[in-house]
């Protein structure tokens, strides 16, 4: 055991291997070798350099978005009368940023005032006062219970509450949507971006977009792909959804602005690409999008409000992209990596030559040469030998 360990250590410290070039005249191996090199060459040039632009350094962007909407809608509702709805009425928030809601439908509870009234059946049905704990508010309650059980209508009793009365009843959503004209509303998107690494600034109002063009253009992915004015109906349809059904219960639509810029060309070629996505599926557990807001006023010294349950389309504007420009460092790194990948051809062909082909033993003899130290060198004495020689023994094993 000790002798074997000594031999292993001796071999580790006192042996050295060096590559030996062997020219193999084998058509099969030669063709495979060149094919692998060709595949590597196509990968390095076609994918790494041309498609992935491995010769460029890249930079992310910083972005700012603002929006403006235009359009009018008219409603005729009991308790509210005829009303014209403009952008100040149906856009939330009113200043418009990268995320906003356009109201398309609503349920109004008019003339609410603080007082006592019967709760909505969803907030608590009762048989007598024992079922109404004073001061308690259920999950769907619209006020604080007083402890009394009172008639809600001719057939149902509910707990009396103190809160805004009369309570909201929202089980019937108007169909079609009250603000169905929203399909023709227009949205103007103003987007400014910067690539800080390259000190390049761009806007979506590119060179082709001027004042005259903007007054008459409306975005179309083929006819007017650079127009920053969008029809809400077109945006929703391009997201894969139906505007009328979305307008009734609300939903969410994503608008992406993608900037992929090659700054090796003139900066005017850096242009935005718009895409639209439906972000809520129809089979969502909680379909639609809604929220509530109130209009407060004073009538005969009493604080009152009109309560609106708003159904609307929420638009989220997302900006993404990057810019690339030639740089010698990534270029040299990519070239070096590509040259290294060429070594794959040698490894695979050696595997085929030395372990798979029928004449593998013969090729091993030609590939590897074993050199041994046969004795002391010139000027050295070997007490165990009558003479000093230096020789090389080549072990040739035939297949």
UniProtKB/Swiss-Prot annotation:
User: Which residues take part in binding ATP?
Assistant: 70, 186, 286, 290, 292, 309
* Null mutant phenotype: Deficient male mice display reduced fertility due to decreased vas deferens contractility and reduced numbers of ejaculated sperm and slight hypertension. P2xr1 deficiency reduces neutrophil recruitment and activation on inflamed arteriolar endothelia, which is accompanied by an impairment of platelet aggregation and fibrin generation.
- Please name the GO terms that the record assigns under molecular function: ATP binding; extracellularly ATP-gated monoatomic cation channel activity; identical protein binding; ligand-gated calcium channel activity; monoatomic cation channel activity; protein-containing complex binding; purinergic nucleotide receptor activity; suramin binding
What InterPro entries does UniProt report for this protein, alphabetically? Answer: P2X1_purnocptor (IPR003044), P2X_extracellular_dom_sf (IPR027309), P2X_purnocptor (IPR001429), P2X_RECEPTOR_CS (IPR053792)
Q: Which reaction does it catalyse?
A: Ca(2+)(in) = Ca(2+)(out); K(+)(in) = K(+)(out); Na(+)(in) = Na(+)(out)
Gene Ontology BP term (one): monoatomic ion transport
Region of interest (Pore-forming motif), ranges: 331-338
How does this protein lie in the membrane? Multi-pass membrane protein
For whether the record's keyword set contains Signal, the answer is no
For this UniProt entry, what is the primary localization, expressed as one broad class?
Answer: membrane
UniProt-annotated location(s): Cell membrane
Q: Topological domain, Extracellular: which ranges?
A: 51-338
Q: Where are the transmembrane segments?
A: 29-50, 339-358
Which UniProt keywords are present, listed alphabetically? Apoptosis, ATP-binding, Cell membrane, Disulfide bond, Glycoprotein, Ion channel, Ion transport, Ligand-gated ion channel, Membrane, Nucleotide-binding, Phosphoprotein, Receptor, Transmembrane, Transmembrane helix, Transport
Q: Write out the GO cellular component annotations.
A: external side of plasma membrane; glutamatergic synapse; membrane raft; postsynaptic membrane; presynaptic active zone membrane; protein-containing complex
**Chain residue ranges for the region called Disordered:** 374-399
Question: Any idea which residues bear Phosphothreonine here?
Answer: 389
In this chain, where does the modification Phosphoserine occur? 387-388
Q: Where is the composition biased (Polar residues)?
A: 385-399
Query: Family per UniProt?
Result: Belongs to the P2X receptor family.
| Record note on quaternary structure | Functional P2XRs are organized as homomeric and heteromeric trimers. Forms heterodimer with P2RX2. Forms heterodimer with P2RX4. Forms heterodimer with P2RX5.
What is its biological role?
ATP-gated nonselective transmembrane cation channel permeable to potassium, sodium and with relatively high calcium permeability. Furthermore, CTP functions as a weak affinity agonist for P2RX1. Plays a role in male fertility, bladder contraction and platelet aggregation. Specifically, plays an important role in neurogenic contraction of smooth muscle of the vas deferens, and therefore is essential for normal male reproductive function. In addition, contributes to smooth muscle contractions of the urinary bladder.
**Domain comment in the entry:** The N-terminal 20 to 23 and 27 to 29 residues seem to play a role in the cholesterol-dependent gating of this receptor.
Q: What is this protein called?
A: P2X purinoceptor 1
Q: Quick one: which gene encodes this?
A: P2rx1
